[in-house]
């Protein structure tokens, strides 16, 4: 049985909202960790911070051998698309959150 286009659009909208919420949770989690590590008080450009996060993500995915051994960090192989978005959100959120909480 075929679904009407309106029902498919509704399902897509629900999935997009779920994705937005999941990305927000991921960004908040990474932001909290970054603040605990002291990144909130450091003046650094967002592009430079994003590059550092991408390097860190490669390390945990096994792209670069780390001293402690690489692990997946619980990330799915397709987590690459949201990793950049999360890192960008953390870059702007860490600077804002760090000034307000410190």
Curated annotation (Swiss-Prot):
Family the entry assigns: To A.tumefaciens Ti plasmid TraC.
Region listing for Disordered, in residue ranges: 61-102
InterPro entries hit by this protein: Conjugal_Transfer_TraC, TraC
Organism: Sinorhizobium fredii (strain NBRC 101917 / NGR234)
Gene designation per UniProt: traC
Entry keywords, A to Z: Conjugation, Plasmid
Protein name stated in the entry: Probable conjugal transfer protein TraC
A UniProt-annotated Pfam family: TraC
Composition bias, Gly residues: 62-72
Biased composition (Low complexity): 73-93
